[in-house]
Amino acid sequence: MATATSTRYETIIGIEVHAQLRTESKMFCGCPTSAPPGEPDEPNTRVCPVCLGMPGTLPVINRRAVELVIRTGIALDCHVETEAVRFERKNYFYPDLPKGYQISQYALPLCSNGRLSVPVPAEGADVSIGITRAHLEEDTARLQHGGRGYSLVDFNRAGVPLMEIVTEPDVRSPAQARAYGETLRDILRHIGASDGDMDTGSMRIEGNISLRPMGSSGFGTKVEVKNLNSFRSLEHAMEFEAERHAEALERGEALVQETRGWDENGGRTISQRSKEEANDYRYFPEPDLPPLRPSRDWIAEIRDAMPELPAARRERYEQVLGLSAYDAGVLTADVALADYFDRVVAAGIGPKSAANWVTGEFSRLLNQHAADGLRATEVALRPEGLAELIGEVDGGRVSGTNAKTVLATVFASGESPRAVIEREGLGQVHDAGLIEREVAAVLAEFPEQVAEYRGGKQQIYGFLVGQVMKRTAGRADAKLVNGELRRQLDG
């Protein structure tokens, strides 16, 4: 049934994304952005006078962070400013902001006026979404609310390089909002700008929504929704708000410009505070930082070194390698998995066979280690090792079933699959005489099933094949087994 939202009002959505940049040090000081591998991230251990906002300290711009925002701007078809990029102070008070202001960009951002084509599977079409800006700023500290009348502040996150990406109000449905977020995350991961992990807060997303009567060109009262920890939450929050706005408009009620939070358990939004405007933050130029002027030569170097973007990679997989749209989508949704697949193919394996194994059994094993944060490129079994195993299967030297057993062994050990096959005696049996004897033994052992098959019960055939494979520990050549079984059953 059509709702008031779909029949009388047009949904207008703009999206803001904050993504932590993949740098080793913070935005304006030399403190590390993460704890050393294998060590606990103790609170307030990755701090210095600069990121704690001590008087007399001066910020120094992180060149790598600037490069990653330029790379993002290129990927989003933005204009990259070369004349004067200005840092500004965004003034507000909150316990997680040690200086009492945040160094950001406002009037003169690094990247602006971009555009992104977004496939929307739920609508069966692509939409073009304008990118207003992509700029640099510093992250805030992390508050830990203990529920005992006070909160704790961990300043390890304070000063971590942050990129804010803001869209034009071009999004017209909750499904488009979700698709935009997923597409942007894939791009950021492919170009190495951010890990895009919403679970850890390294990528945070907010939706701004309003409704207007169909055919109108103005804008309605805008509401911002926060506390969105997944793209699914974004979609559901926008659906809820669209219906809430439509119902209020139908009743003639005035909507309030405000910030609301998404209640995942309740499936609704909750009012948090009135929505701030830009002038509430009293932006003014950061006096401790000169204007930033990226050279055209440097921007050209970054452009020339750009990795393949997800859309181009997906097209290559489908048009050049002949993969299905589904397999291409699964691979490009995980840049590490796609990189692993490319190396398997480079090792001489056919693309379709490689895709079957990488998106199938290999991904299943990878998902078992999801809690450890293991990525495809970090697995002990190198792509060349998986290519060796697939080659053994394609060459008929090991069965698919036994190959899965081998993969489970070498996935974590990194051993040569060929060595494991030989050591465990898992190689495929091609001895026609042996297979003939094993088939005869199975038919003698199961006379009732043989009679049922010969009486027309075709599904018994699979049972008989399974018994032959069981007697040979899964090593018999399936093609020879089928041929011999047919010969003896029909002879």
Label the predicted regions:
Residues 22, 243, 338, 359-367, ...:
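Amphipathic alpha-helical core segments of compact helical bundles
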Residues 1-308, 319, 325, 346-350:
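Basic, nucleic-acid-interacting segments
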Residues 200-213, 281-282, 318-342, 351-369, ...:
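Core structural elements
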Residues 155-160, 198-205, 214-217, 428-491:
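C-terminal non-catalytic interaction appendages of large macromolecular assemblies
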Residues 322-323, 345-354, 395-398, 455-459:
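Structural motif
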Residues 373-387, 391, 397-471:
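Strongly charged, low-complexity linkers/loops
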Residues 298-305, 312, 342-349, 386-398:
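Extended, non-catalytic structural segments that build the interaction scaffolds
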